């Protein structure tokens, strides 16, 4: 029997409201697009860019974290909250829509940056660029 032992996420520290996003781009968006964004039901967003709405308007910015850093943080949190022996883990599923790079994949990068926390014989799956359904697909893959 296959058991899902634990799951965790990590999000960037920079938080902004959708209204800020629309406000900073008001002069560049059509009324139809503004209406569509307003009806999505997403009030709060996260970004690795410390000034994301202004960045879209052309102001320079810098990244506050990388997808790999967030993945390592989530992996460490996942193992800590589970509280079990990391050697019992048989599969690492890493999911993102915004990888730092295409290759090596996110799961491989996490394995390399967890400094021996995970077994080198651990199987890995990286799920990238799959849209909103990536969370559900990740759980499905983990239970397969």
Where are these regions (language model features)?
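Short glycine-rich or small-residue beta-strand-to-loop segments that form or flank ligand, phosphate
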Residues: 90-98
């Amino acid at each position: 029997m296959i058991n899902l032992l634990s799951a965790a996420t990590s999000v960037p520290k920079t938080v902004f409201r959708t209204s800020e996003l629309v406000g900073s781009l008001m002069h560049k968006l059509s009324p139809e697009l503004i209406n569509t964004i307003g009806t999505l039901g997403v009030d709060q967003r996260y970004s690795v860019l410390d000034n994301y709405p202004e960045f879209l308007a052309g102001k320079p910015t810098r990244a506050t974290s990388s997808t790999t850093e967030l993945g390592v943080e989530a992996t460490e949190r996942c193992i800590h909250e589970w509280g079990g022996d990391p050697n019992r883990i048989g599969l690492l599923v890493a999911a993102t829509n915004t990888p730092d790079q295409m290759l090596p994949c996110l799961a491989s990068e996490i394995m390399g940056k967890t400094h021996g926390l995970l077994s080198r014989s651990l199987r890995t799956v990286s799920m990238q660029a799959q849209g909103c359904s990536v969370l559900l697909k990740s759980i499905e893959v983990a239970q397969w």
